[in-house]
Every structure is written in structure tokens, then in C-alpha cells.
Amino acid sequence: MLGYACMNHTLRDREPPLRCNRDMRKATFEERGVAYASELALQNFEDLHAILAWNAANDVGFYRCSSTLVPWNSQFDLAALPDYEAIRAVAERCGALVEREGMRLTFHPDYWCRLGSDSADTRATSVDAVDYHADWLDLMGLARSPYYGINVHIGATYGDEAATAERFRDAVADLSPGARARLTVENDDTESLWSVPELVDALDGTDVPVLFDYHHHTFTDRGLTYREAFDRAAATWGAVRPAAHYSEPARLHGADARPQAHAEVPADVPAWLRARADVMIEAGGKEQAVFAVRDATTAP
């Protein structure tokens, strides 16, 4: 199946717009507190259900939800929210819809989530972030499996790849059971960072799958073809169907952009990748990119 991340342009442009990423600045949280966070979280879950229903009606089976689904969740327990019971009821409807329609729902915490950081404070904050993403999936009643993944990057080597890998593994051990069971790690888009084979070696013995990012592999190929790298990553998923990311460089489509920048709409997704993985299309066109790829694939 094919999917897109976070924003749905079709629904965002409606009145009122549908979106599940309502957030607030720190100053607003300090002023309005948990009550306002609860209000936003309830709205986000309600709109997540509407987005998932739209996806199902439009045969889009894969969706990455925003990491601001519950704003400022690092500052409170989910069950402490004033609207917790209402949020839980909507979350359960979201999970039931996902399961009924055979859909796949994942998360991708922000760039600052660094489980292998050389800062103990950053590692602790990152563990907390992955844990509360898992709490949201638990609230929806979705299985503790990388099928409903929480995807991260190791993101740096801090001058010592082996020590970073060890810190990452230690942080994985500190995760809650629900977070640890859903964690996935993807290859990076900078030559000096983490490639697929390096991740496979670093994660050996952790049961954490490696998620293959097609475009990122361009920058960290380590002499492997795209298929060879995917095979190495796919072997870490066990019985679970792998997830993968696909994007095309904006430069390929005529944009004056850095090599890592994504095109608004890719031309296509390789047939072999679609056959062997659920593919998240990372593109500014969001759901429209999925439709374009699907139309290109089915055209005579």
C-alpha cells in the first residue's frame, strides 16, 4: 500500500479545515496549561478519525500521523487531561477504523529525538517522547508491533559510532514495552551518518527493524544497490511486512534545491519496492502525490 505524511491538502483547504497537528508555543502552554492542551488533543483526535475515514474512502491505506497529536505531552500524563475520557473514546474509534479497513498508522518523532545522543538529558527526553507516542497507539488499541511503527533516526555518530550504537541500544532497553515493540530506525541522508548496513549491525540483538529510505540511500549507499540495501533492511522485520520511505529529489524535477530536498510529486515508485513493502511517499504533494503515483502506475 501507499501512504502520505501528516497534512492532507484536500481536507486542510476545507472550511473548517481538518488537521491533527494543532499545537501551541511554550508561552501559550505556560499561560493556558493542561486544559488547553486537552482541548487541542481532543480536536486533533477527532480530525484524525475524519482523515482516516477519508483515506479509507479513497483507498489510501498508509498514514503517518503528526507528532503534535497531543501537544506538550512531555509535560503531563495523558490520563490527567480533563477531556481524557472523550479523547479515549475517539482514539478507540480511530483504532477500530484502522483495523477494520486494514490500514497502517505510524509516527515519526521530530529531529530532536536522539536516543543515541551523547547528552544524558537528550536521551531521557527522547525516551519519554517515544514512550508517549506509544501511549497514543495504545489508547487506539493498536497492536504493539512495528507494523504500527514509531520511526526515528540515530541521526549522528558523535565522533564514535560504536559508542553511539551502545548508547542507542541502552536507550532502547529503557523504553516502555509498547514503545520498544513499535520502534523502527531509518537510514540517514548524509554520507557521514548512518547507512542501512551500519544500522543493521548496530541494532543486532535488539529486534528493532531498519526502515529503508530510498532517497536517503543515495547519500549513504556504502556500495550497495537500492535493492541490496532494501534486502538488508527487510531481513530485520521478521514476519511483519516492512515499511519504506520513497521520495525523489526536487532537483530531478527542475527545482533549484539542495540534493536532499523532496520533490512535490514523484514520477513513480519502483514496482519491486511496492511489491515488497508498504511505501510512505514523502512529498509536499501529500495525498495528491499518492494519487499521482497511483494513476501513473495504473495508466496504460
Regions found by a protein language model. Give the residues of each.
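Alpha/beta catalytic barrel-like cores
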Residues: 1-104, 113-142, 146, 174, ...
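Short, small-residue-enriched loops and turns at beta-alpha junctions
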Residues: 112-114, 156-160, 190-192, 218-219, ...
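Active-site glycine-rich loop that binds ribose-phosphate moieties when present
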Residues: 132, 159-174, 189-194
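Glycine-rich phosphate-binding "P-loop"
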Residues: 148-163, 255-260
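Extended, charged catalytic domains and RNA/DNA-binding interfaces, predominantly
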Residues: 149, 156-160, 169, 182, ...
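Catalytic beta/alpha-barrel core
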Residues: 151, 182-189, 211-214, 282
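Long, repeat-rich segments with strong aromatic
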Residues: 198-222
